[in-house]
A protein has these predicted regions:
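Hydrophobic helical h-region of N-terminal Sec-dependent signal peptides
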Residues: 11-17
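Exported/periplasmic ABC-transporter solute-binding proteins
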Residues: 24-70, 74, 80-83, 87-90, ...
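Bacterial N-terminal signal peptides that target proteins for export
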Residues: 1-10
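C-terminal motif of bacterial Sec signal peptides marking the signal peptidase cleavage site
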Residues: 18-22
């Protein structure tokens, strides 16, 4: 009887140990998962990024992805143009000013107060309504169209149709980049002006004879991109500077970035963004460039 009791006690004790061990292991896994979850959401804060509409789609998508991993960070992305972005980040009314141009190029901006974070490169190209029946122009012809010297598509081998120029607003970095590369100081013809790449794309698509220019990320099969001097507007040609109309995409902060803003900007330069998202959305990674450009527009080999 005693022997049976002892065996029963031993078995009961062993069972108790197994239960306690199981509970202990279960608690460790839960604690580990909890710690991991907590660490992924320790970054918190509110970020407002305003400016370039050329850069806007990339920042919007990156912000969405970043917030999935950092649920305590709230990011608002808006357009308005590069000039607006630079002015507002200088005034500290926004966290980040998105721009297609260097701060040094914008009158009224003290670039010494701002910190430049280059996150991508964007190519830009003339685009026409498909009805114009034009696919290639010389750089001189492009200049003559946007300065008003050429007013009919038949004069450059296209349809007998009046040219309707659609320009960007004066605060646009896309416009500044295009005019620096193409007009080179010449006065643009008076024409309608639009505030965003998206609006321009829709107008060119729907208006017979229309011509404008767009960031590569906005060019689709509903408009006709124009080759210049038989050079196609491609990423590869931008990377080597064979295609001359391109700019860096800047995300400026007022002083040094910190907290959630610094972490988001680090994410913008991560492999996840630079090797995947950038290309998927029609931009060019800053790491793929074989040349570099300064604020004066001087291009040199890297």
């Amino acid at each position: 009887m005693k022997k049976k009791t002892i065996i029963t006690l031993v078995l009961s004790f062993a069972t108790l140990l197994l239960v306690l061990t199981g509970c202990g292991n279960s608690g460790s896994k839960s604690s580990s998962a909890s710690t991991k979850s907590d660490s992924s959401s320790t970054t918190s804060g509110k970020i407002t990024a305003v400016g370039s509409t050329a850069l806007q789609p990339l920042v919007e998508k990156a912000a969405t992805n970043f917030q999935k991993k950092n649920s305590k960070v709230n990011i608002t992305v808006q357009g308005g143009g590069s000039g607006t972005g630079l002015s507002q980040v200088q005034d500290k009314s926004v966290t980040i000013g998105n721009s297609d141009i260097f701060a040094e190029e914008k009158q009224g901006i003290d670039s010494k107060k701002l910190t430049d974070h280059k996150v991508a490169v964007v190519g830009m190209a003339p685009v026409v309504n498909k009805d114009a029946n034009v696919k290639n122009l010389s750089m001189e012809q492009v200049k003559d169209i946007f300065t008003g010297k050429i007013t009919n598509w038949k004069d450059v081998g296209g349809k007998d149709e009046k040219i309707t120029v659609v320009n960007r607003a004066k605060g646009s970095g896309t416009r500044a980049t295009f005019e620096a590369a193409v007009l080179k100081g010449a006065q643009a013809v008076k024409s309608q002006e639009q505030d965003s790449n998206g609006t321009v794309q829709k107008i060119v698509e729907s208006t017979p004879g229309a011509v404008s220019y767009l960031a590569f990320s906005y060019i689709n099969d509903k408009v006709q991109p124009i080759s210049i001097d038989n050079v196609k507007p491609t990423d590869e040609n931008v990377e080597s500077d064979k295609w001359k109309i391109w700019s860096y995409e800047h995300m400026y902060t007022n002083g040094k970035a910190d907290g959630a803003t610094a972490k988001f900007l680090d994410y913008m330069n991560s492999d996840e963004v630079q090797k995947s998202l950038v290309k998927d959305m029609g931009y060019i990674s800053i790491h793929n460039m074989k040349v570099q450009k300064d604020s004066k527009g001087t291009v040199s080999s890297k």
